[in-house]
Amino acid sequence: MTSGYRQAVAMKVARRTQAERTEATTSALVDAARELFARDGYAATSLAAVAARADVTKGAVYHHFEGKQQLFEAVFTREVERMAVPVVEAYSRKKDPWDAFKAGCRAFLDECLDPDLQRIVLLDALTAIGWEEVRRLEGPLLEMMELGILQAAEAGRIAPRPPEPLAHFLYGALCETAMIVARADDQKVAHRQAITEIGRILDGLAID
């Protein structure tokens, strides 16, 4: 084994180790930020508090993120990804494409009962990062809705139509309804009412 080969291997290992450390620190910062954003809210959470919770320096925070807004975006993105899992699972359990779509919408509203998600996604996001950024980061959820509408139309369960307008209409309705639930004095009652009303809208679109 030549010294050049050993040096190349050592450099590769060093790069991988550095990448792993970077990923670990980034993940720790996002975890800490999520905890504090959910508990204290975006406005009341400082980067110094996030650094202390993650057991790193404030300089380390700025090494990985430009500022609090970008850190919130990372937390928000993770919440959207986490939220998508039960939605996809609920969708996949139904054979009928429109029943699957309705199950996915129900799962979305069920997930919105989580108090941490409510604080981060429903209550603070618009103030923290703005409407356009929220919609951009929620793009995967909208794309899932468009696909579900397209599949239901192809199966003859709803009338043929361009999927994008209806997806935006229904997603907007789900988000507004979820915010009503999040602000309700009795969230369980509000959630049941939301499920009922969304169900009526979706049933009205179905072709028997």
Put a short name on every predicted segment.
Residues E81-V85, I129-A155, E164-H168, R192, ...:
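Amphipathic alpha-helical packing segments from all-alpha helical-bundle domains
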Residues A74, V85-D116, L166-L170:
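Hydrophobic alpha-helical connector segments
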Residues L109-L147, E154, M179, R183:
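Short secondary-structure transition hinges
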Residues G4, A107-D110, E146, R161-I180, ...:
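Hydrophobic alpha-helical segments that form the core
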Residues M1-D40, A44-V56, Q69-E73:
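Basic, helix-initiating cap at the start of DNA-binding domains
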Residues Y62-F65, Q69:
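A short His-aromatic
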Residues G59:
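Key DNA-contact positions within bacterial/archaeal DNA-binding proteins
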Residues E73-E79:
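Alpha-helical DNA-contacting segments of helix-turn-helix folds
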